[in-house]
């Protein structure tokens, strides 16, 4: 499988990295090989209503007039409890979006950790998806009675061939809605794959593995992946591609900022490319009116109030580093770090309302400080900012956006992070011995808003 640069229009400046080559790349098949089908994959949509209509329009354009079989693959986290409009409306826009997908092409959803944000019982979520004509896959089990919430594998007719689709979720229970955690039994991804993947893929023609386990879990699945399979990852809000023999592994971005197209060829090769979803593009008429009406109905004056203005749009990574720098300034320390999924999307240009800002900084919390040596701080910085090109082996899954200033020969350095990252320091900092103390009267959202925007 060769790797070639994408055309400029495919370049996704917001978050793009490709593990296999500098810049954003495509894993490409031979241009003269017969196309068997195309998978349009996306994950971690999180009720991103500012781009939902544009994403649907892009999918419509991809499929319109094509005689090639298509499959739409949604790899979890469709809903977002932090979106007040989603909560108040019962996710009416999300459900309408989902309902349009099977009208375009066969659609498969693999359950993520936010898909029961609005409806705690996943059985109800799965039943509603199936009523729309969506196929659901998952390895999550109902801990109350041992029933699976969905089949772990399905075989779908796909043009002249068939496609076996396998689904796996993240076993990080603390990322699921609290009300549902006692109802969920989720195996460790690697252990589950070791025990089940070969059986589930036995006799398969074409193969698609959808994992919402995140990079750390996927790393245990990949060695078990049959050559020539396509694997789509999610959960970490990353955008990258990786080749393994004739297999392709891709993370597709988040917040409806992008989708990934995987083209399967008759010679066994797979071409993978990423397309940005333009915020300024025309939304699909099938969704545009509903989005406008729903926002007008459910947003309060306070949520429509302008917090400040941004002179330019920032990518997600730029936003993360700007927030980290603002946290460091507010706490009077040398370095700031914020968890990657504390953020949703990049800061837009122009006036930013409270509602729009809440999509940028999803969660509030305390700021926590710790003291480290300059050498340890350098190590944390090397681990941070994984929106850059880097190999799969270097990726940690959960990561931090970080910003630091000079130390001027200091023997110690101080850092600040959120209470979530302090509590989960093993995942984010790669250590368990940092001693944190609270930075009094500082909150994540207040500091971020003041640092990002000029009032």
Feature names for model-found ranges:
Residues 36, 42, 47, 256-330, ...:
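Catalytic centers of hydrolytic enzymes
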Residues 15-19:
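Sec-dependent signal peptide hydrophobic core
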Residues 3-6, 10-13, 31-282, 318-320, ...:
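Acidic, metal/ion-coordinating pockets
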């Amino acid at each position: 499988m060769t790797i070639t640069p994408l055309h400029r229009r495919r370049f996704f400046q917001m978050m793009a990295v490709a593990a296999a080559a500098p810049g954003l790349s495509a894993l490409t098949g031979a241009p003269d090989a017969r196309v068997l089908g195309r998978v349009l994959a996306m994950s971690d949509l999180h009720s991103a209503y500012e781009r939902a209509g544009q994403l649907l329009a892009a999918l419509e354009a991809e499929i319109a007039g094509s005689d090639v079989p298509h499959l739409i693959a949604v790899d979890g986290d469709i809903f977002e409890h932090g979106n007040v409009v989603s909560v108040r409306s019962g996710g009416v826009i999300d459900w309408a979006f989902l309902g349009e997908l099977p009208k375009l092409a066969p659609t498969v959803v693999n359950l993520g950790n936010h898909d029961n944000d609005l409806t705690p019982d996943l059985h109800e979520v799965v039943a509603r998806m199936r009523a729309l004509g969506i196929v659901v896959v998952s390895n999550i089990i109902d801990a109350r009675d041992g029933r699976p919430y969905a089949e772990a594998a399905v075989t779908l007719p796909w043009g002249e061939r068939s496609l076996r689709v396998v689904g796996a979720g993240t076993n990080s229970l603390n990322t699921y809605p609290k009300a549902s955690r006692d109802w969920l039994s989720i195996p460790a991804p690697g252990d589950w794959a070791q025990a089940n993947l070969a059986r589930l893929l036995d006799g398969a023609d074409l193969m698609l593995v959808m994992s919402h386990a995140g990079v750390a879990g996927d790393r245990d699945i990949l060695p078990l992946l049959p050559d020539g399979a396509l694997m789509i990852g999610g959960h970490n809000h990353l955008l990258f591609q990786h080749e393994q023999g004739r297999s392709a592994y891709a993370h597709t971005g988040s917040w409806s900022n992008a989708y990934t197209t995987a083209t399967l060829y008759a010679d066994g090769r797979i071409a993978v490319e990423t397309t940005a979803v333009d915020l300024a593009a025309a939304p699909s008429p099938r969704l545009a009116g509903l989005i406008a009406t729903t926002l007008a109905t459910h947003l309060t004056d306070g949520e429509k109030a302008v917090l400040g203005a941004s002179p330019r749009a920032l990518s997600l990574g730029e936003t993360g580093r700007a927030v980290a720098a603002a946290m460091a300034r507010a706490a009077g320390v040398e370095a700031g770090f914020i968890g990657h999924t504390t953020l949703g999307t990049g800061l837009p240009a122009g006036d930013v309302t409270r509602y729009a800002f809440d999509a940028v900084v999803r969660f509030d919390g305390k700021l926590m400080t710790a003291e480290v040596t300059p050498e340890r701080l350098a190590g944390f910085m090397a681990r941070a900012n994984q929106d850059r090109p880097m190999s799969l082996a270097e990726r940690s899954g959960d990561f931090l956006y970080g910003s630091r200033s000079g130390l001027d020969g200091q023997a110690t350095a101080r850092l600040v992070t959120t209470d979530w990252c302090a509590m989960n320091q093993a995942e984010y900092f790669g250590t368990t011995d940092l001693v944190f103390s609270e930075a009094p009267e500082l909150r994540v959202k207040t500091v971020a808003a003041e640092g990002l925007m000029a009032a």
